[in-house]
Design a protein with these regions (language model features):
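Beta/alpha (TIM)-barrel catalytic core signal, keyed to glycine-rich beta->alpha loops juxtaposed to Asp/Glu
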Residues: 33, 129-323
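Residues at the N-termini of beta-strands
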Residues: 15, 48, 121-124, 154-155, ...
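Short, acidic/polar
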Residues: 29-41, 100-117, 162-171
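Short loop/turn motifs at secondary-structure junctions
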Residues: 12, 42-45, 72, 118-121, ...
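N-terminal binding-site loop/beta-alpha segment at the start of enzyme catalytic domains
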Residues: 1-76
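Active-site groove signature of glycoside hydrolases
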Residues: 114-133
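Surface-exposed, active-site-proximal loop segments in enzymatic domains
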Residues: 86-100
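A short, structured active-site edge motif that brings together acidic residues
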Residues: 74-87
Length: 323
């Protein structure tokens, strides 16, 4: 597993991390299976784990805390997120800071996450949603600065709305944001336009999330794909999105090199960009951990393939089905 610099923090983290959304105790998740997959990831050199209070109201955080405490000999980086007070995703400009991240709410959830994790500090605490209309509000800035000065949180970050990579750039200029989490993949290349250059300039780490576009870039999405009742993908891949996603993914099949899967190609597309500090594919099953983390061994894609993949950029606007 190769390591990358994580912005200005001084950390060097695994270039493929672990997204723990699927370990929130949802339907289909199994704690024993999840713990086994996490252990495998550590053995393979993964040291960056991204969770959130909202993933099962602390359930995923507790699993991560158990993992970290079981490996005192290793430096495992813990990233978690504060939910918005109003419980609404995504953030919208009409929501005031008092409705989303007032100072007392920031501290309360920082302390709640510390309790769930069973740790003395959080490496990276992130706002789970963000709108840049709040960027200049000094109240969240003071709350973040206080948590850092007290040593409860080492670094702070933002998780950006889907398909709004510029909606966070004003906050970066405060100097308080150390990392940005953004959707970036073969289809979603827009962060390269303005966000990534600013992150380079300010030495802000980039966490690339949704590397498989919720599943279309695994190569397994079909027009008749269905998921268990309650699975969010039934909403995301509804009539407005499924047909287009399948067509876009099928257009990539001729580009997949022999001996490579579409999922590996998707991960290595991101690895080919040095602006990405780490990628956090969601993983629950052992076989996915092994194949996804193994992509680090193969390195970037060749320049010709990268150029051809760039033609598959797909700029989209947020919609009710994408929330």
């Amino acid at each position: 597993m190769k390591l990358r610099h994580f912005g200005r923090t001084g950390w060097k983290v695994s270039e493929i991390g672990y997204g723990m959304w699927g370990m929130g105790g949802w339907s289909g998740s199994d704690d024993a299976e999840s713990s086994g997959s996490l252990e495998c990831a550590v053995e393979m050199g993964c040291d960056f784990f991204d969770t959130a209070w909202a993933y099962g109201e602390g359930h995923s955080e507790r699993l991560l805390g158990e993992l970290v405490r079981a490996h005192p000999e290793k430096r495992l980086y813990v990233a978690t997120k504060i939910p918005p007070k109003n419980g609404k995703w995504p953030a919208r400009s009409e929501y005031r800071l008092d409705e989303t991240f007032p100072p007392d709410h920031i501290r309360r959830y920082a302390e709640s996450s510390l309790k769930n994790l069973g740790l003395e500090r959080i490496d990276l605490l992130q706002f789970h949603v963000w709108d840049d209309s709040w960027a200049e509000d000094e109240r969240w800035q003071r709350a973040v600065d206080d948590l850092k000065r007290e040593g409860l949180v080492l670094a702070f970050g933002l998780s950006l709305n889907r398909w709004e990579p510029e909606n966070g750039m004003r906050a970066l200029h405060t100097g308080l944001i150390d990392a940005i989490q953004v959707i970036y993949n073969i289809f979603d290349q827009a962060p390269e336009d303005e966000l990534f250059p600013l992150c380079r300039q300010l030495e802000v780490a980039v966490i690339a999330r949704v590397p498989f576009d919720e599943g279309s870039l695994t190569g397994k999405l079909r027009l008749d794909s269905r998921w268990p009742e309650g699975d969010w993908r039934n909403h995301y891949f509804g009539p407005e999105n499924l047909k287009a996603s399948v067509a876009r993914a099928e257009a990539l099949h001729p580009l997949i090199p022999q001996g490579m899967t579409m999922a590996e190609m998707a991960l290595r597309f991101i690895l080919s960009n040095p602006d990405a500090s780490t990628i956090i594919p969601g993983m629950r099953k052992l076989r996915h951990v092994e194949t996804n983390l193994g992509a680090s061994d193969h390195g970037p894609l060749d320049a010709e393939l990268l150029e051809r993949l760039r033609a598959h950029r797909w700029d989209r606007e947020p919609a009710p089905w994408s929330d």
